[in-house]
């Protein structure tokens, strides 16, 4: 069969498999590619190909992640699978592989286990919008009542972390049966049912271009006779010449007007998500703007100093700290383009944080940053990355 041309006309969605070790995340990933390959929607990736995940660096942290892609009738998917639990933690916190939704894999034989719980909590903290459950290894359970009990347990667990436990689709099957072609009903058919659930239940993410304009400022120049130009890569939205925009963060918020957009020395009418541009600002002095601020659509993002975060602290081997830290730890928090010092408060019951831990913590910055939930940051000491985090809740 001739290979199909990669179609860009389907909506794209990023997903991944999460769940406890040995519950079948990688087998399921392989099974999805195998079943979808029959209709030309994927190229089959065997278990061993996925399991040997290459290492990548994200925000100075090494993570092993396997990427596969496939398509259903409805969408094109990029799917991430990680070999180890630590890789999941790092992946979700750094946002190295953005997840628009996830497939939670739970073994019917074991039911929810500690990492099941931890991955659900992480998904909640880092803002994964929706989950679908695959209850795997159902061929290892003879008693249908037991399957019902496991399903109830999963739903209660999801609800306890503020996911809609009663509504989340739970598909029962066996990834191995699909890989071995042994039992069509719980193998092949269950995988197709799972993908239908993923198509229907995981919402299509808004394209970056359609969101409100935001550009982190990387550099500021003064051009005689023309005014002040700020440069950076537009993170989302569109900026048009003549539009009113805000400069947010570090200093009090000010309004200005975009009087020009320039890319590769050419003048444009507008810049959009993904473009590296220079934006000319009307009546703004060079000293009024600095790296670390953002340009944005008025009112779309606000400056804050206090937030709750989920963070991963690097091990000594990863180039991180050699010793634990305690409440009142004062590192720098690197947001977008700049470092801001902040004070850490650990939650009650957490005495200290060891290298290699992931932890929930509150942070108070010494200067405000344009902030919203899901914003990623690095934790640094004198320019060296010692951790990574994500804003789970803006407090003040």
Curated annotation (Swiss-Prot):
HAMAP family: EF_Tu_B. Gene3D superfamilies: P-loop containing nucleotide triphosphate hydrolases, Translation factors. Residues 19-26 are annotated as: G1. This is Elongation factor Tu. Mg(2+) binds at residue 26. InterPro entries: EF-Tu_GTP-bd, EF-Tu_GTPase, EFTu-like_2, EFTU_2, G_TR_CS, P-loop_NTPase, Small_GTP-bd, T_Tr_GTP-bd_dom. Belongs to the TRAFAC class translation factor GTPase superfamily. Classic translation factor GTPase family. EF-Tu/EF-1A subfamily. Residues 60-64 are annotated as: G2. Residues 10-206 form the tr-type G domain. Its EC number is 3.6.5.3.
